[in-house]
């Protein structure tokens, strides 16, 4: 069996849930599964978008660390 990509799987769920020859409860379950997958994909999309935005921000404004020499401590009083 070939791997199903996301679009094909979504299309399959929609077609099966709209099929008049299957049990209504089964069709409802398929619709719920489709909605859950859509919600998960939306969350993943937003996380990826936020991650890309953060990585671009870091590239534009690199963090500079000022380290003390080994064995020396700062007196911060």
UniProtKB/Swiss-Prot annotation:
Transmembrane segments: none
Name assigned to this protein: Protein OPG157
Chain positions covered by the region annotation Disordered: 53-77
Keywords for the protein's UniProt record, in alphabetical order: Phosphoprotein
Tree of life domain: Viruses
Subunit structure: Interacts with protein OPG092; the interaction stabilizes both proteins. Interacts with protein OPG062.
Classification of source organism: Viruses, Varidnaviria, Bamfordvirae, Nucleocytoviricota, Pokkesviricetes
Entry PTM: Phosphorylated by viral OPG054 kinase.
Stated role: Required for the association between the dense viroplasm and the viral membranes to form the mature virion (MV).
Family label: Belongs to the orthopoxvirus OPG157 family.
Alphabetized InterPro entries for the sequence: Chordopox_A30L (IPR009257)
